[in-house]
Each structure stands twice: as structure tokens, then as C-alpha cells.
Curated annotation (Swiss-Prot):
Enzymatic reactions: a 1,2-diacyl-sn-glycero-3-phosphocholine + H2O = a 1-acyl-sn-glycero-3-phosphocholine + a fatty acid + H(+)
Protein name: Phospholipase A2 pkP2
PROSITE patterns listed in its UniProt record: PA2_ASP (PS00119), PA2_HIS (PS00118)
Binding-site positions, Ca(2+): 55, 57, 59, 76
Subcellular location: Secreted
This protein's record includes keyword Ion transport: no
CDD domains: PLA2c (cd00125)
GO molecular function per UniProt: calcium ion binding; calcium-dependent phospholipase A2 activity; phospholipid binding; signaling receptor binding
Length: 152
């Protein structure tokens, strides 16, 4: 085999090994992102809301900085309720990994009737938040803020 071909093959193998160390996104996070894309076409939810305000992204504390951040606070509270919901007791029913069925048509979201009780609850958490984001302004100055300063 040509040495140049071997180098290319080696580079591909090394890059694939490196990619395997990157953890996949929880499936529900992908569904939630797609719901937001339904209500806000052209948006980039995983980038735009991963580190926004006091509540969008991991954790959350203090007073929301704006309406979009309040959507995240409400969503966080809904997920907290889902974790305590009697129908969501299995570890597979975690709101971060639970898969549910929904439809998106013309910017309108519907949680399907074939969801179990836990899936329906989590679907409605995500649906409500996606609709909330669609009605709230996105303020770039609230992205990647100093939470120690602004989230008291």
C-alpha cells in the first residue's frame, strides 16, 4: 500500500478514536432543541440557550434576567416536577433522557396521544418552554453572563 494512503488511513482512525471520547447529547435534549427549532425556525438552541442568563443551561439560581431566562426557569421547575411525578419513577423516565412523541406543523407543536403518562408530562414541559421562547426576545447581552454577579 502507498505510504500516503497509510497516513490518511491512520489519520482517519486517530480522529475517530478522538470522536468516540466525546459524550453524546442526551436524546431528550435533542428533542427539546428540535421543538425550539419548530417554534423559532432558523434558531440554534443548543448554542443560543446553553449558557444564557441565570437559568438556561446547567443549574440555575437567582432572579431571571429577562423573559427568555424566565422560560428556562419555568422549564427547570417543570423538570423538577417531572422527577417527582408518580409516573416517572424509573431511571429511564428521567426528563433528560425520556423519549416522547410529538409533531411539528407550521410552527405548532403537539404532544402525541401515544405517549405514556411520564412522556406526556415531559413533552408538555418542553412544548411549553419552546412556545415561551418563541414569544420572548433573545438578548445577546445575556449570553454567557457572569452568574456570580447577575444571578443573586
Amino acid at each position: 500500500m502507498n505510504p500516503a494512503h497509510l497516513l490518511v488511513l491512520l489519520a482517519v482512525c486517530v480522529s475517530l478514536l478522538g470522536a468516540s471520547a466525546i459524550p453524546p447529547l442526551p436524546l431528550n435534549l435533542v428533542q427539546f432543541s428540535n421543538m425550539i427549532k419548530c417554534t423559532i425556525p432558523g434558531s440554534r438552541p443548543l448554542l443560543d440557550y446553553a449558557d444564557y442568563g441565570c437559568y438556561c443551561g446547567a443549574g440555575g439560581s437567582g432572579t431571571p434576567v429577562d423573559e427568555s431566562d424566565r422560560c428556562c426557569q419555568t422549564h427547570d421547575n417543570c423538570y423538577s416536577q417531572a422527577k417527582k411525578h408518580p409516573a416517572c419513577k424509573s431511571p429511564l423516565d428521567s426528563p433528560y433522557i425520556k423519549i416522547y412523541s410529538y409533531t411539528c406543523s407550521g410552527g405548532s407543536l403537539t404532544c402525541r396521544d401515544d405517549n405514556d403518562e411520564c412522556g406526556a408530562f415531559i413533552c408538555n414541559c418542553d412544548r411549553t418552554a419552546a412556545i415561551c421562547f418563541a414569544g420572548a426576545p433573545y438578548n445577546k447581552e445575556n449570553y454567557n453572563i457572569d452568574t456570580k454577579k447577575h444571578c443573586k
